[in-house]
Amino acid sequence: MGIKKFKPTTNGRRNMTGSDFAEITKTKPEKSLLVSKSKTAGRNAYGRITVRHRGGGHKRKYRLIDFKRVKDNVPATVKAIEYDPNRSANIALLVYADGVKSYILAPKGLKVGQVVESGKDVDIKVGNTLPLANIPVGTVIHNIELKPGKGGQLVRSAGTSAQLLGKEGKYAIIRLTSGEVRMILVTCRATIGAVGNEQHELIKVGKAGRARWAGKRPQSRGSVMNPNDHPHGGGEGKAPVGRPSPMSPWGKKTTGLKTRSKKARSNKFIVRSRNKK
């Protein structure tokens, strides 16, 4: 994927960049793999805002992605690379030898016409999915399961990858994109290669309207709110925070406060924290 720069014909276009979509080979999605997706605008079942600054945006259909890859030893041909509005990565349309179609995350380097497989004894090549027990140490992987059979949950964003560092008994040791090193059961599956569309992080939105197309609403600073809306609010003019530390809208410290539970059951699987230098 390349980055397309726009001429400064307006102020909004001046610093705007976007994808050139050079990798995309098909513009209309596969109808059988689409489901409707209703908007929540950041509200829960009671209609109360649980996530601020969300609402509006372009209407989308959800693409059913196969994160499990349990159709073993049936070769699938890559028919197209498509855009997915619901994620940063592109997706690949697979057609299996028995005629079944499915979407997967498009790894870096995957081309139309390539054949991919899943199973214990498949080749170590980009797009193939295997249990961690069958993947050589040092291999770059993505779409990693946390529980066997649940489907990939880790390393799914554009340009991300993890590396298999070693194996100890029934656990594999993996270094994630964040730098965290953790143990995962060797019976969990992962896909070979890094996620494609790696230049996604270089895109500059350029104008407020483009953020609105994505369903993101404006964000106000706490210091310009009233005291009943935010701990930083109130005062005459540009008043200071007036507290020992900056606060979240709910009165929690925002600088250095640990949010992870010390009793989290998964702590024992973390070999090295992502926060350690």
Swiss-Prot record:
GO-annotated molecular function: rRNA binding; structural constituent of ribosome; transferase activity
Keyword match rRNA-binding: yes
One GO-annotated biological process of the protein: cytoplasmic translation
InterPro entries: NA-bd_OB-fold (IPR012340), Rib_uL2_dom2 (IPR014722), Ribosomal_uL2 (IPR002171), Ribosomal_uL2_bac/org-type (IPR005880), Ribosomal_uL2_C (IPR022669), Ribosomal_uL2_CS (IPR022671), Ribosomal_uL2_dom3 (IPR014726), Ribosomal_uL2_RNA-bd_dom (IPR022666)
Database matches in SMART domains: Ribosomal_L2, Ribosomal_L2_C
Keyword annotations from UniProtKB, A to Z: Ribonucleoprotein, Ribosomal protein, RNA-binding, rRNA-binding
Role: One of the primary rRNA binding proteins. Required for association of the 30S and 50S subunits to form the 70S ribosome, for tRNA binding and peptide bond formation. It has been suggested to have peptidyltransferase activity; this is somewhat controversial. Makes several contacts with the 16S rRNA in the 70S ribosome.
Protein name: Large ribosomal subunit protein uL2
Origin species: Ligilactobacillus salivarius (strain UCC118) (Lactobacillus salivarius)
Gene: rplB
